[in-house]
Amino acid sequence: MAEIIHHSNVFTWAFHVSEYDGAPLLLLGSFSSVASVSLKRSGDLLLFERFTLPARTRSVALLSSHFLQSESGRHSIANILIATENGKCYLLQLVKTPEKAFPTIRIRDEFVLDTRMYNHEQLGKSIDLCPNASLWATNSFAGDIVFFFSHHPSLSKQVFAQLSIDGIILHTIFVPPKRSSSSCVTYVCLFLDSNSNPRINVYRWSKTETFSDASSYITFSIPVPSEFSLASHIIPCSNIPDHFLVLLETKICLLSVPQIECGDLKFLQTDLPCSGSHNYPLSIANDNETPNCCYLTYENGDLYRIRYSILSIDINLIGKTGSSLGNLILPCYPYIVFCGDCSDTLVYDVSVSPMSFFGSLIACAPMWDFVYSSSRHNTLLDEDINCNTVYATAGIGKSGCLVTMRYGCSSTTLLEAILTEGAVLSGIINSNHNSEFYAWLTYPWQTQILRLHLDGVVEDVTESLFLDDIKALYVINYQNTFIIITGKSIYAVTPSCTKYNLLEVSGDEEFVLAAYNELIFIVKKDLMNFKSQLLTLKLNTLSNGTLELQSLPDSFDLHDVPTCITSFSLERKLLVILVHPSPYFECVFYDETSHSSVYKVPLTGFQFGYLPHSISYLRKSNRAVYVLISSNSTLLTVYVTLTLEGVPDFKVYSNPISTDLPLTLQSPSDEFSTIYAWSDYLYIVGIDMETEQPTLNQILEVNDSFTCVSGIYDIPNKFQNSESRIIVYYSNNTLYLSELWLPQRTFSSKLNLAATPKRLLVDKYTNTLIIGCCHVLVNEITTSGLAFYDLTNSRLFPVNWPSMDIKGKPIFKPEELLYSMSFWIVADDQKRKYRYLCIGTGVRKNGLTTGRLLILTMNKDHDSNAIELRNVITINMKDPIYSVCSIGKHGLCYATGRKIGVKMLDLDSKKFCNSDCELPVRSPIVSMSTYKDYVYTSSLRDSVAVFQYDSENNSLNLVCSDTSSRLGIDCFYISQKKLLFSCDKDRLLTCFKVEGEVCTSTREQMLQPILTTVSQTKTNALTNHLKYSVIRVDKDNHNIVWGLMGCTLDGNIFKILMPNDPTSSDTIIYSDT
């Protein structure tokens, strides 16, 4: 299936849907996904969830939150109506469920809006909601308008009215009516008639309660000035009935419906301010906080506030952002959100003057290329994809940049205390005070107890608890009195630091394990015969305020000494689980009458490579619990339920994990999820409420804070909040109190290049990222250039245009455009390898475009820490060189104009030795890769074509090509599966089975997709690069699953995994981007 690794942050629509925990909650949407975002944290936009849409979005509308009744236990925050290009309407619902801390996005309903799929004339061009009636409307470019009822409990297709306009619809809105005619519905449409003249039609219904009211409407139509055809936005005036604003390139106009009814063309209008040359208004939106007020943005980032009335329109500048803004603005006081148009999502605080920057989500679009520096031979391990940083190029001209993206979550350190080396955090102890709790640390020689205050104060209370040189098995805070369980005794310490003993054992016995859950459970070991016994103790408070231990009559002799213990309740019945070194565990069950019974459960089929060392549990309900048992590389899960007869039932299964080190489990503070870690691995175990199965998720922290972790715990629930998880952990001799911001998401940073970065290469020898750029401006003349990024130190080398070689000569000519860039690896007979940097360009001069093939050597001067380039060979050609790659041991394949050719290098003379080897092709090849002597290409007329190089005859021959003529973008061949993937301008991702020799028959040369119906499905975004093989190793079945990586023009990076059977119905997988 397709999985998006890094989502695009190019949002084309946005809504302020609610307030969540005192902060604005937004829904941001792209063509392919929806994200819920909170603005609570200063300097960061907290992204809760991503939801991938079934098809590409065409239009959206925000419905009222009471549009659908909330289900039991679920609180509906917002409902979004989305029309997609597959002809369907989807109702997306943002709901808050008791099981999850964050709002969840889901599809609530759907129906077919138009059977004309993937057609620009289908309905769904825009969606308008009626403010005073239960109606919504949608339209098409072809002039169709359909009105639907919206007061039904589900999105059934119930049409109120249908209209048809002879022309092209540009903009439509519902206009709020006067209070005296609140049942009246007014609909305004700006369109171009059959003669391309702009007109405005007004449709008015006196009432819209039943189907019979649909035909009882009146309509008015007026011609408007031709400049109205350039209107970018139309917005209703919510506080001025029967009025709306029209935004033009140089003017803003206030129109009234009664004026249109009278045919009056003298609209109230005013000229827009001149905001610099070649800067035009981008977006306009109503200010919901201030009546008769809206915001206006310009391309250069200027922000204006417009106040309007039926008499005047006033425009005032309120701020300059200093950066290019998107074409969408969303006011949500005190913030304003800017997004869209391949721009970053920017948030500014307008409650202060001048307005201040709040936070951003970096948009890596348009994305041209991406690389993983950790790849080996163009292959990635699936388990390493999320753990590594990806580098991508994006932007055009001055906005060009290098973007680094990493998947994970962020953390904020609230407190840190440097301690003695060698501790393990063994637990968190609650306190009766509201602002403090205790951390329990275990050293090989003693136990240490620290009191932690939320204001940052750390206090060592070990000495007051009489723990000097004593190692505790368990520590309990019972009614502000500490109960300390050691190997030889149990004693209590009062708040006044008075100590008294509760229980002691004889010299040939010792306590080895303890647990507490209403009762104290202790495993006592006999040192003489190595037998053990489970004791059950109850705490009682005496009249003088002291405590005593009451030993319950039930004590159990155990078969051997267990290694870990835990206790929990099921419907007020206590259960104690003890895990033994042999593959079995024992469960002591206490019913309501305190009668106890013992169950011995064998772990058949499971072998502990190492001793089971930690145990915890997750609660599913009052009658079901998941018990987690940790051993080396294995997490055993025991599902414990109560039967109808009230006795426990057990089911056992395992989850292998990816670390060889032991894991420490905590007793979960909320009993629904637990966090655990060891060394550099951090995990969260929870319960998936839909599948009712435990989920094991590795948490990646982008700040690399969690290294050498030995013990991690949640702080008590009373200090937690819904947006984050506050944890305590011990790492590198330091105790940290940190706030972990979940869920995980992509974190991006941007380095500006002031050019268009089109190609990326990773040089393993110098550990450098090579960035091939176009549109480099040197002395007011555009050319190309090279930039370099140091992967070792994570910094960009100083960029100096124009790019020079080691002799100080410019590498690129004026008006030279970089098209392709590749490494050429040449191997000689002694298996020595030489590496060259090959660049294909196009040079425009005197109205003609020629091409150059540049072959360079690249080295790193370690003294000056600079990259040195030397021009070795330059080949001039009649046409631009669109693609270049290596073939064979010392061959170079290139595509120039409508030809593909191969040149072979003589290693002795360092010159090309073969005669001309070129083959005409139908159209220019835009992408090319090789495997052995085969060349896989994408061209402007063929999504894929395969050629073979015959070294004996020095000739290229066509092997096969696509059956249909499609404008190809890129292709990628997975040799292990003999599968060739292609992407094209129709947004198709197609897979072909490629195996065979050169065919003489034209029909035999045609490639057939494996599954035509599936491969012809459109993807949500344009895939423009296919890159990297992906290997997933199934450790259970010892199977290897292959896949590939790809990216889309709007900034998504995705992976595709294929089943082992290439002829199965799941072989063709397309990106749901």
From Swiss-Prot:
Single Gene Ontology MF annotation: ATP binding
Source organism of the structure: Schizosaccharomyces pombe (strain 972 / ATCC 24843) (Fission yeast)
Cleaved signal peptide residues: 1-36
Binding site for ATP: 392-399
Assigned keywords, A-Z: ATP-binding, Glycoprotein, Nucleotide-binding, Signal
Protein name per UniProt: Uncharacterized protein C3H8.05c
Top-level taxonomy: Eukaryota, Fungi, Dikarya, Ascomycota, Taphrinomycotina
Residues carrying sugar: 132, 544, 632, 703, 732, 953
Gene Ontology CC: one annotated term: Cul8-RING ubiquitin ligase complex
Coiled coil regions in record: none
GO annotation (BP), single: nonfunctional rRNA decay
Gene3D superfamilies: YVTN repeat-like/Quinoprotein amine dehydrogenase
InterPro entries registered for this protein in UniProt: Cleavage/polyA-sp_fac_asu_C (IPR004871), RSE1/DDB1/CFT1/CPSF1 (IPR050358), WD40/YVTN_repeat-like_dom_sf (IPR015943)
